[in-house]
Each structure stands twice: as structure tokens, then as C-alpha cells.
């Protein structure tokens, strides 16, 4: 672990291209604070408004059904825990984070090519957590939206399964119909 003098050093990467060296330090209230150290390229993620905002937007909203319990269960409810467990991975882009001295590569962590945790997928969808040992990353921790949902990798591709409200459960159908109309 790249920890020096009470701070942990990290690298923001785009696939295997290092983009930003940054660190996290705990303040007097034991809250993590993130600081940019050095940009390693002239490129920036689209819409970049600073490191704390960038990292925060990669995390699933706490109000999403079942997600807060999952975040707490796997140590992702704290921003630094979220980085250590999920590497801030997303299915929306190819940015990710690792500790500065970690040998991890994009090939080892990519959500596009590596299997998803079925346990986490099911817990994100139905709220039932059957195990406490997290062995792989999962797109559930970084998926936006209010209703319960999960990602499944099948032979023909990656699919998002969604539920709707408790009363009518028509939101996924409405989204499907809207997509059909837009074509």
C-alpha cells in the first residue's frame, strides 16, 4: 500500500495510461480528503470539475434501493474504501484508480472483459446479501439511478436488469417504450 506520512498515494488511469497522481489524507474528523499532486498528461476526463467531484460521481447514489446496505457491507461507504474495493470502475468509460505502488493493470480490472460478481448483482437487485467476502469488482457500485438494478454478463453481451417502483413497476417498461419511439 502506498501510504506515506498518513497519506495514501493513488493514480488515476485511462486504461493503462497514467493521468493523475493524487493522494488521500484523513482530516481531524477521520474523513478522507483527496488532493491532486501532478497531472501526467494534458488530457482531462470530459466534464472534469476537480478530483473530489470526479470521484464522487463514479459512486452509485446512496438513495438507490439496496445500494447503501451493499456499500456498507463491502466497505465502500467511505470514499477511500470505495476506491480500494471498486477502483472507481464504471461501464461508462475506461477511467479507474489504483494505489500508486499497485501492479494492477487495466486487463485485470476492466468491467468490459472480466466476470461480474453474481452475489453482488443479486444483492443489488433484490437486497439479499448472502456472503460477506468480496472477491471481485462489480459495476453495481458505480451505476447511477434510483431503482434497484444489476448487470449481468451473458454470452451475447452485458445487460442491465432493472426493477421499478414497489407499486406499479412500470418504469423499466416506460424506458423500453421510449427507446423504441426514439428509433
Feature locations, PLM:
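Conserved, well-structured beta-alpha core segment at the onset of a catalytic domain
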Residues: 1-13, 172-179, 183
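P-loop NTPase switch module centered on the Walker A-proximal segment
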Residues: 2-130
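Conserved ATP-binding subdomain of kinase catalytic cores across diverse folds
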Residues: 112-183
